[in-house]
């Protein structure tokens, strides 16, 4: 059966997207030390602990400089909102500040406001059935984002729907999304080398 993807989502997924580590969920247990280390980094970053934001900021800054060169200084970094307002602040505030310091990229963190919590993606699953995802209420500073070139960051990409939905909201605000960067991309099969 062919999976149909909404063309607005596909439009964002067709842009330049990159990730730094392969992320294997905890239920995938037969993995090597490299995958375990990547998993620990993702968890530490998501939980805002062990100064993981510094390691991820360094990876992000290096990628931005290699990908965009001096152009990065005229761009803005924005992170996909987390399901809970307090997690958005604890996970991304210092990270965005640090990436901005390292690269000169504009910091879009304070221009996104999470107004209402929502269920996280994992809590929408019920066995093989998924419950309907509730749209998250966020406020974007449309004046700030208008005509800006944006790079969107998220911690983990699985289907890309959260990233694409947020990128579309940014573009509805007048921004031009260049693509997305992710700390990890979800994988389910580990290949030993």
Give the location of each predicted region:
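Active-site-facing substrate-recognition patch
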Residues: 1-72, 76, 113-146, 185-186
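PRPP-dependent phosphoribosyltransferase catalytic core
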Residues: 2-11, 164-193
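Short, well-ordered alpha-helices that flank and scaffold nucleotide-derived cofactor binding pockets
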Residues: 62, 97, 101, 168, ...
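Short beta-strand-loop/turn "lid" adjacent to the catalytic site in phosphate-handling enzymes
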Residues: 76-91
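Short catalytic/ligand-binding loop motif for oxyanion handling, primarily in non-cytosolic enzymes
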Residues: 85-89, 118-120, 188-189
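Charged helix-capping and loop-helix junction motifs
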Residues: 91-97
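Long C-terminal interaction/binding lobes of large macromolecular proteins
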Residues: 140-141, 148-151, 165-170
